[in-house]
Regions:
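Bacterial Sec-dependent N-terminal signal peptides
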Residues: 1-25, 141
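Terminal accessory carbohydrate-recognition/targeting modules of carbohydrate-active enzymes
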Residues: 23-243
Length: 243
């Protein structure tokens, strides 16, 4: 009797395993987009846009960041798209379409490392932070191995394709990433350009205050960046989870 029960259990178990195996074969295999990177996570040549927001102040203002350097401001009735272009060796390159882009996120900071054969062996690094007390953000560009090439960074800010966003994500209604994109023919396009210093630190800063994009003296912009980084670092180190 016991042997009969054991045989029955074995047969049922084998059938169930077969069913699970067949079911698993029919499931679409998914590849992880992001991978652990220190206390953050990163991806290489990702395609997700406006999926990681940076918050600073207590207002609803936020900066949406992407797997590549294209950004958007979320501010009720005042949304903006922000993108950058590098001009080097007589050519212009949209930073969101370079050949190699590693994007990393850690505790309120988004970082990018970019390379492109068209501009030689140069490496362009970018990090962006939200301001802690005001509605805005700051970008820090750093250039390496560009030699004596003149590097110009151009920032562009304009309205987003959609002006009024849905606020019902909790019930499944939300706007797709294309809502944050720039329209084909922007009506409120503003362009700001800066030249990468060839003496001293090859760094260049941009800032957006509310919806105004600007650049300025590196010494002043650097202080704003460092203050935002200090605030972020202090906040991040106040609570640490180890798994």
């Amino acid at each position: 009797m016991k042997q009969t029960k054991l045989k029955t259990i074995a047969v049922v178990s084998a059938c169930m395993m077969g069913m699970l195996s067949s079911s698993a074969q029919g499931v679409m295999q998914r590849t992880a987009n992001y991978h652990p990177d220190g206390r953050g996570f990163s991806c290489v040549n990702g395609n997700n846009r406006y999926t990681r927001a940076l918050y600073g102040s207590v207002d609803e203002w936020r900066l949406e960041t992407s797997d590549r350097p294209i950004f958007a401001i979320f501010k009720k009735n005042n949304h903006r798209n922000i993108r950058f272009v590098i001009k080097c060796n007589g050519q212009a390159f949209q930073l969101d379409s370079v050949e190699y882009c590693k994007a990393r996120y850690e505790a309120g900071k988004r970082e990018y490392l970019m390379k492109d054969k068209r501009w030689g062996s140069g490496v362009l690094k970018l990090s962006v932070l939200a301001y802690p007390q005001t509605e805005g953000a700051v970008w820090k560009f750093a250039a390496e191995n560009f030699g004596k090439a003149k590097i110009e960074i151009v920032g562009m800010i304009c309205e987003t394709r959609v002006s009024k966003f849905k606020r019902a994500g909790d019930i499944g209604k939300f706007d797709g990433p294309e809502a944050f994109d720039a329209p084909a023919q922007p009506k409120m396009l503003s362009t700001v350009a800066g030249i990468m210093p060839q003496k001293g630190a090859a760094e260049l800063y941009f800032s957006v205050d509310n919806t105004v994009l600007s650049t300025g003296k590196n010494s002043e912009m650097c202080k704003r960046y460092q203050a935002a980084e200090q605030w972020r670092s202090d906040l991040a180190s106040s609570v640490i989870f180890n798994t």
